[in-house]
Swiss-Prot record:
Organism for this UniProt entry: Oryctolagus cuniculus
Membrane-spanning segments: none
Domain spans labelled PDZ: 11-91, 151-231
Region named Disordered: 109-148, 244-303
An example Gene Ontology biological process: protein localization to plasma membrane
UniProt tissue specificity: Detected in kidney glomeruli.
Gene3D superfamilies named among the record's database cross-references: 2.30.42.10
GO molecular function, one term: type 2 metabotropic glutamate receptor binding
CDD domains, per database record: PDZ_NHERF-like
Subunit structure, interactors included: Homodimer, and heterodimer with NHERF1. Binds ADRB2, SLC9A3, P2RY1, P2YR2, SRY, RDX, PDZK1 and LPAR2. Found in a complex with EZR, PODXL and NHERF2. Interacts (via the PDZ domains) with PODXL (via the C-terminal PDZ-binding motif DTHL); interaction is detected in glomerular epithelium cells. Binds PODXL. Interacts with SGK1 and KCNJ1/ROMK1. Interacts (via the PDZ domains) with SLC26A6.
Name this polypeptide is given: Na(+)/H(+) exchange regulatory cofactor NHE-RF2
Polar residues bias spans: 255-264
Amino acid sequence: MAAPEPLRPRLCRLVRGEQGYGFHLHGEKGRRGQFIRRVEPGSPAEAAALRAGDRLVEVNGVNVEGETHHQVVQRIKAVEGETRLLVVDKETDEELRRRQLTCTEDMAQRGLPPAHDPWEPKPDWARAGSLSSDAGQKDVNGPPRELRPRLCHLRKGPQGYGFNLHSDKSRPGQYIRSVDPGSPAAHSGLCAQDRLIEVNGQNVEGLRHAEVVARIKAKEDEARLLLVDPETDEYFKRLRVTPTEEHVEGPLPSPITNGTSPAQDASAWKRDPFQESGLHLSPTAAEAKEKARATRVNKRAPQMDWNRKREIFSNF
């Protein structure tokens, strides 16, 4: 009995035929990403070993896992007459997710690393283990990784900086949606899912998407971005501390032990609901009740200005 074929991504090179590539791409409700729905018999897609149910990871070397259906289609059409697709079947996809591995073209050639390989690559947002109680995260075969913000210096190339910035309606802030391989953004250490904290030394957490874009474009050919990956973001939020450039190499905030940390107290003071009016006081029970009532009355969000829809995504 033949041994089962090892799990690995597949790199499919398609040359367009008279009837196109011969496959159907679609998104699935409840699942992230784009999937191959159907492959036409005798088509270039079938000849390239594309299969129904495959999940699309890269198009022509660019990761598209976080992109919309329309954006993925445009990337496929960008190179006329041919395309290169990195895909994974369901079993390979599940194994990559279980081991928290980032799918790459190299894996299509060499296969997945051994399950117990201490050098197994992991994305910045998925280091082994869970958040520890301090500012580092234990790795089974190495020292703890300190959860620090990253300061990325970018110089604009002929095609721009090479990253896509977007806002997520489910959470505040601006996030790196995708980074083009080989771009200035990639070389400077930007990663997909990073949250943007500062632009050129100025905090932008409370700004609208268009305002953040304007800050990035303020300097014509360069930008200095302070970012946090999801783990670091969660750590600083737990401590209620705003990341700054000082945290890149300087002392990190102390973890919470046996109660509230000083950082928590300071942050709680800063978030006093009366601070904006100049009164640094805690509300009385009656004031809190009135504030809650007013919030319920005015909780309906203002109608969206559809002329500003383009603020949601920006390419650099």
